[in-house]
Amino acid sequence: MISFKVAPLADLEQHWQQAAEWSFEAWRHDFPSDTVQTYLDQYALARSKPEQLLEVFAAVTDNDQLLGVATLVHDDELPDALEPGPWLAAVFVTSDARKFGVGSALVNQVVDRARDLDYTRLFLYTEHAHSWYETKGWIKIRDTIFLGLHHTVMQLDLSGQTPSALQQ
């Protein structure tokens, strides 16, 4: 078992570089023009422009080791997206921390925050993890091709269940 907390990445600047490197590696096939600096700039924007919907959350251990990140964003850059947003985006958990509830905690934090902001729906798109999200109450709404790769677009209704009702 890993003991960890989820907090805004804006408050954990010591982890920005690692989070940016992970994000760049994880999604460079989807966003080939992005760089590590792209993510660092997003983290700075999230901290400096609270009026924009761009919030990044990080899971960190009690001894301040970064385990993963997840983002709540108005637009997740999916070309031709019909969905209005907001989006759960850029969920990443380091391989050593998987199967310990880190991903669930990060997703639940984003869901909580979207609900706090009075959104009634939340969207995501995923290349590989649609089955995992379905176990958390997300429903598939369509398939799409993005840069030649199949992705599943999903939605979570925020008006009914509370995050604590979502399965860990």
Regions found by a protein language model. Name each.
Residues Y125-A129, R142-Q168:
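C-terminal "cap" of GNAT-fold acetyltransferases
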Residues E134-T144:
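Conserved acetyl-CoA-binding loop of GNAT-fold acetyltransferases
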Residues A114-T126:
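Conserved GNAT acetyl-CoA-binding A-motif
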Residues M1-Q18, S159-Q168:
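Conserved N-terminal entry element of GNAT/NAT acetyltransferase domains
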Residues V56-A58, D64-D75, W87, F92:
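Conserved beta-strand in the GNAT
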Residues D76-P84:
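A short, polar/charged loop-to-alpha-helix boundary motif
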Residues S23, R28-T61, E77:
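Active-site rim helix/loop that mediates acceptor-substrate recognition in acyltransferases
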Residues A97, G101-Q109:
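Conserved acetyl-CoA pyrophosphate-binding loop and the N-cap/start of the following alpha-helix
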